[in-house]
């Protein structure tokens, strides 16, 4: 009898140890998924969240994380489905429900499901206290639905709640996307009335002037920011000079950014690649893209890989460009410019095959790839969520 008790106790202890071990592994996987999400390592994060979901671990949070990854990588319907699963989990608290509703509305906006997005925005307004990002999101949805007065009202609330340079730029970009630049410019002008005090302030002011194509004032503000220690200012100075076609000065500032920000040099390498493309030095562009990819987050990888397509097209290596564009489209499903580029390349490669001689392909219908080269400045509307 005593031996049986010992065996039972050992079995119970072993079972508890196994359960604890599984729980510990699931916790590590979940924590790593959160870290990968924050760092923009979306492929890893998605696999880790899916592992947690399969294990039934922290289902609400894991579905939420998976939904955010899919939102940021262009799988909008997948994001909506996962975020809905998170909302339907009985363990999801009220504050978490608000957060998930915000993300789902952003995914619905991106998926052009405007009625559903507005319904979620209305639920937020009815059940929760709104913050600046909520007003901004609602404004974006209203703008997409051509409800201009409602959009204006919500954008005014957003800027009133968060009168920062960043919010002004986001509202400007929302209007710019609807060919209503003048409506957005007034927010940039309002932001410039704020007195700069810190390096970040001067950097943001320089960014505003950059968006307004006022490059002289942009250089002044950004130079002050750089002198005060802003690394980002050197990157944007490179963009300012690049916009003016001064690749020599642009290179200098992009290199300064790389040297100063050793932990995240990818944007600087992307800038150098843009200079190379402009100068027609395509082999150097590929080298800089390769170096940038070695340290790139998923968002930075998007810019670099798009520009890689551009380079191969400029080299007239259309087969490689097509292959790269197909790979890109599988990863970044929401990029309209890349989708157009893919269609163009499919047509060109098909025509070459039909002609039977790639060297005689007509280049008169050259795509706008160079003009579309990704500077990495896009700030999509869901980034606040």
Report each predicted region and the residues it spans.
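Short coil turns that delineate tetratricopeptide repeat
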Residues: 57, 91, 95, 128-130, ...
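Register position in tetratricopeptide repeats
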Residues: 38, 72-73, 110, 144-145, ...
């Amino acid at each position: 009898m005593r031996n049986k008790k010992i065996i039972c106790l050992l079995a119970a202890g072993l079972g508890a140890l196994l359960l604890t071990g599984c729980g510990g592994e699931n916790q590590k996987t979940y924590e790593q998924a959160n870290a990968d999400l924050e760092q923009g390592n979306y492929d890893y994060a998605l696999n880790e969240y899916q592992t947690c979901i399969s294990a039934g671990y922290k289902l609400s949070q894991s579905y939420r994380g998976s939904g955010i990854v899919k939102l940021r990588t262009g799988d909008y319907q997948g994001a909506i489905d996962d975020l809905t699963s998170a909302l339907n989990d009985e363990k999801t608290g009220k504050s978490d429900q608000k957060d998930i509703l915000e993300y789902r509305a952003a995914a619905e906006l991106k998926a052009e499901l405007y009625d559903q997005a507005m319904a979620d925005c209305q639920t937020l307004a009815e059940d929760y206290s709104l913050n600046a990002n909520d007003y901004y999101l609602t404004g974006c949805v209203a703008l997409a639905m051509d409800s201009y007065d409602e959009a204006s009202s919500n954008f005014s609330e957003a800027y009133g709640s968060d009168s920062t340079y960043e919010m002004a730029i986001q509202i400007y970009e929302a209007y710019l996307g609807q060919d209503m630049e003048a409506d957005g410019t007034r927010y940039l002008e309002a932001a410039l009335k704020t007195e700069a005090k810190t390096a970040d302030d001067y950097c943001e002011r320089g960014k505003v002037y950059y968006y307004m194509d006022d490059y002289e004032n942009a250089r002044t503000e950004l130079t002050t920011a750089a002198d005060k220690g802003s690394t980002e200012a050197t990157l944007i100075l490179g963009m300012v000079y690049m916009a003016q076609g001064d690749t020599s000065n642009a290179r200098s500032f992009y290199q300064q950014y790389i040297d100063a920000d050793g932990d995240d040099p990818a944007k600087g390498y992307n800038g150098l690649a843009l200079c190379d493309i402009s100068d027609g030095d395509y082999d150097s562009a590929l080298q800089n893209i390769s170096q940038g990819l070695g340290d790139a987050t998923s968002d930075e990888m998007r810019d670099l890989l798009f520009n890689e397509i551009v380079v191969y097209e400029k080299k007239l290596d259309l087969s490689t460009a097509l292959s790269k564009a197909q790979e890109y489209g599988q990863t970044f499903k929401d990029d309209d410019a890349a989708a157009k580029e893919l269609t163009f390349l499919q047509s060109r490669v098909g025509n070459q095959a039909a002609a039977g001689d790639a060297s005689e392909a007509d280049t008169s219908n050259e795509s706008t790839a160079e003009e579309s080269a990704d500077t990495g400045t896009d700030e999509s509307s869901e980034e606040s969520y």
